[in-house]
């Protein structure tokens, strides 16, 4: 083939200049990829445990071996000291708020006899709640470590049935949860105190600390619980995919191929890589049964660790939602005769935002638990579908054992055994909320001054009653 040469030389000024800076783009891309990719279990949970370690909720963090690159749990003396210091600072700050006339953010917005009781209840519940969260998160750290070890063991077994776990998905989920919780907390706290300062109200530093630490600790506890429920959900999805793939192979192949060696897994969407593993169906079911048993044990261990934290968070959230809904309804219905520096819009906005914040907390807990429970319920249907299709006596026996295991081992999350954490909790909370709101509204309408007035604070009233008795 002939190639024509250019008759006239090209003027260098007619061509555009192109700047190539590979040295700047590639390092940034590599750093970003390192930031959002993970190859190990501990590596994908590293951001969450760094946050819990800094805030004193755990005595360990995820360290990295510079020689091998492996991630592992590392306990330090500073972790124990840090946790004790956080608890001591929190107790001291809450004691100052009680000493400062039972100071709370809500008391600056609203003053009535019911709000005195509500403020006192919120202060006491916040003090007890955050203390319980710290103690139940800090003391039984061994349960958290045991749960992580179970996840590591089941991940090794999942690889034997052809599953390669995508830890980067968990890492990105943990980043998303932490960033969203952080943004919501910062926006709500900053907005609240900006409204107070704009109305020439100066809260004490103790109130700043208690208000911020209460929301921060609750947000971190919810983020950690969400990550663990996501780990449980992911592994249940993997087991279900393995069993579904086995059923699909039996549908597409002849019945004679059931007793032969066959491929256990082709592809598991975003949870695995393309892998080919030759195994007998009975072996696949046996290993899936063992993995399911480990998942149930890990979920039970996680529930033991989080159970009192969840009870505390849901109780605090319910109490705050009840009083916030009452304050907003009283104002919107025009029954309140409040004396406040704040406009009605600012008043309603603050209590509505606080109510929505704790509604988000309850929804995050319930939905994370509910997703894992729903995935576990699907396993039974898949096992019985395989049981109806198989003709092999050995495979049928394994499936019957798996069916018995599913009857006795079920995944559920409870709040100290008092109630289950699933979507039925929405109905329970809405019913209790309606009942308490009706009681508070009736109490206000039957009171002589509609429950409002200048009055003294809850602490002063208690002191006067004590002096009168003496």
Curated annotation (Swiss-Prot):
One of its GO terms (biological process) is thermosensory behavior. Residues 98-119, 197-204, 331-346, 445-470 are extracellular. It comes from the Eukaryota. GO terms for molecular function: ligand-gated monoatomic ion channel activity; taste receptor activity. Keywords: Cell membrane, Glycoprotein, Membrane, Receptor, Transducer, Transmembrane, Transmembrane helix. Signal peptide: none annotated. Isoforms A and E have taste neuron-specific expression restricted to the labial palps, the internal taste organs in the pharynx, and the legs. In addition to expression in a large number of taste neurons, isoform A is also expressed in a few nonchemosensory neurons, including the campaniform sensilla of the wing, leg stretch receptors, and multiple dendritic neurons in the abdomen. Isoform B is the only receptor not expressed in gustatory receptor neurons in the labellum. It is found in: Cell membrane. Its main location: membrane. Glycans are attached at residues 454, 464, 467. Residues 1-76, 141-175, 226-309, 368-423 are cytoplasmic. InterPro entries: 7TM_chemorcpt. The chain crosses the membrane at residues 77-97, 120-140, 176-196, 205-225, 310-330, 347-367, 424-444. The keyword Ribonucleoprotein does not apply. It holds the Pfam family 7tm_7. GO terms for cellular component: axon; dendrite; membrane; neuronal cell body; plasma membrane. Coiled coil: none annotated. It is a multi-pass membrane protein. The keyword Membrane applies. Probable gustatory receptor which mediates acceptance or avoidance behavior, depending on its substrates. Atypical expression also suggests nongustatory roles in the nervous system and tissues involved in proprioception, hygroreception, and other sensory modalities. It is also possible that it has chemosensory roles in the detection of internal ligands. Belongs to the insect chemoreceptor superfamily. Gustatory receptor (GR) family. Gr66a subfamily. PANTHER family: GUSTATORY RECEPTOR 8A-RELATED (PTHR21143:SF104), INVERTEBRATE GUSTATORY RECEPTOR (PTHR21143). This is Putative gustatory receptor 28b.
């Amino acid at each position: 083939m002939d190639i024509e040469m250019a008759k006239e030389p090209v003027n260098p000024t007619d061509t555009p200049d192109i700047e190539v800076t590979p040295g700047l783009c590639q390092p940034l891309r590599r750093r970003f990829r390192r930031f959002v990719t993970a190859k190990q279990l501990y590596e994908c949970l590293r951001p969450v445990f760094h946050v819990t370690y800094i805030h004193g909720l755990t005595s360990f963090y995820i360290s990295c071996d510079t020689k091998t690159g492996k991630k592992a749990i590392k306990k330090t003396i500073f972790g124990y000291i840090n946790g004790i210091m956080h608890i001591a600072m929190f107790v001291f700050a809450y004691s100052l708020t009680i000493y400062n006339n039972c100071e709370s953010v809500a008391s600056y917005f609203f003053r009535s006899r019911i709000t005195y009781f509500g403020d006192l209840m919120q202060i006491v519940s916040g003090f007890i709640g955050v203390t319980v969260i710290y103690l139940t998160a800090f003391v039984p750290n061994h349960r958290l470590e045991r749960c992580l070890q179970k996840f590591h063991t089941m991940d090794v077994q999942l690889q034997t049935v052809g599953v390669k776990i995508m830890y980067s998905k968990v890492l990105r989920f943990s980043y998303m949860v932490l960033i969203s919780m952080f943004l919501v907390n910062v926006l709500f706290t900053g907005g609240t105190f900006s409204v107070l300062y704009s109305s020439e109200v100066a809260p004490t530093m103790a109130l700043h600390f208690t208000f911020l630490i209460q929301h921060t600790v609750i947000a971190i506890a919810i983020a950690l619980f969400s990550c663990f429920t996501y780990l449980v959900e992911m592994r249940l999805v993997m087991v279900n995919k393995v069993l579904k793939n086995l059923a699909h192979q039996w549908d597409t192949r002849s019945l004679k191929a059931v007793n032969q060696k066959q491929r256990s897994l082709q592809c598991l969407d975003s949870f695995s890589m393309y892998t080919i593993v030759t195994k007998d169906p009975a072996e696949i079911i046996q290993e899936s049964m063992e993995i399911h048993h480990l998942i149930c044990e890990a979920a039970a261990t996680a529930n033991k660790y989080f159970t009192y934290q969840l009870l505390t968070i849901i109780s605090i959230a319910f109490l705050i939602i009840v009083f916030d809904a009452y304050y907003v309804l009283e104002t919107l219905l025009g029954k309140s005769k409040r004396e406040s520096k704040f406009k009605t819009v600012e008043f309603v906005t603050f209590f509505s935002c606080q109510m929505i914040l704790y509604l988000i907390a309850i929804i995050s807990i319930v939905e994370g638990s509910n997703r894992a429970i729903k995935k576990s319920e699907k396993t039974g249907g898949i096992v019985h579908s395989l049981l109806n299709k198989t003709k092999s006596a050995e495979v049928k026996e394994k499936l019957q054992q798996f069916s018995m295991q599913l009857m006795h081992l079920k995944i559920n999350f409870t709040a100290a055994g008092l109630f289950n954490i699933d979507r039925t909790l929405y109905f329970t909370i809405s019913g209790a909320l309606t009942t308490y709101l009706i009681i508070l509204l009736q109490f206000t309408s039957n009171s002589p001054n509609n429950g409002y007035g200048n009055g003294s604070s809850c602490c002063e009233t208690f002191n006067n009653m004590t002096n009168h008795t003496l």
